[in-house]
């Protein structure tokens, strides 16, 4: 009986991994959440895709994500955003039948609590609607500080569903660290931004990612990045990601 349950759990995890190459996106770096929060009444539209670099063996489905995030608090030192994403692989999988995911975040900017204080954020994402399949239910806490010349360093911790976030053996792999570096490359152009981020763990959520962004205008930018999954059995083949971000107004 235990072996049967373990096999069933792993099967669900692999199904969920077909959408594992994307996050129900709060304000992010390349892959992990950031401490940034959408300003009050700002509506953020994100159009992301994750395209596999190989179609041989393992998880090879591409993932497409359209999301809306809205800033909902009118305060300078305490900000909050909520969002919803429509995410699918186009394969009529179990995850595609429940494509809506929800996220929320509350945070404080740098220097808002006291001089030189870090930015802080707590939130959650990948709150799906199909229990045991899309309910990754990842919660997290992050701190970030911008250092002269170096850029912004972020660190935090996450915890999610032990039923959905599992490794290739069906064992829970539902928590770990969040790390990132990002910086506006002003030596080249104030429109150019670069980032590297990492989410630990052997579930489909674990990955090392890097990319660059170009701001075409104040409200429109495009990220191009590369995602290396910690565990090819659960995360699948590496992906190239493009992420179009548009803010209104």
What is each stretch, according to the model?
Residues 134-135, 172-173, 204, 215:
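Low-complexity, polar/charged sequence tracts that form flexible coils or short amphipathic helices
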